[in-house]
Amino acid sequence: MSLLSDLKILLTPIGIPIEAGVFSDKAPDQYLVFVPLVDTFNLEADNKPGVDVQEVRLSLYSKGSYTAAKNAIVRALLSSDITITARQYIGFDAESGYHHYNIDVAQYYEMEEN
């Protein structure tokens, strides 16, 4: 179970190109980059983790209006019970012409018994 793979499956139908870490090809007018933020275990009384918490930043880059894409992403995340922990407009980069908007998400995965 991986939040990165779950996000790719969930958001691919929206039609925005997706990469993990960095966009390696020539950047299109709008694209998403997934950046893993942290993987943590919740503290349990027996010191054995029962839940794996994974957090990822979704960075949306858009040369035009980003609001329709942002709203579609947020709707998809909320309908899949993925926790949105933060949303923030980062700014407009005049040199590249891209607006940059971040959405941070978290998902809790039950640990598998060995």
What is the predicted role of each segment?
Residues 1-55, 61-114:
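Long, contiguous binding/interaction regions
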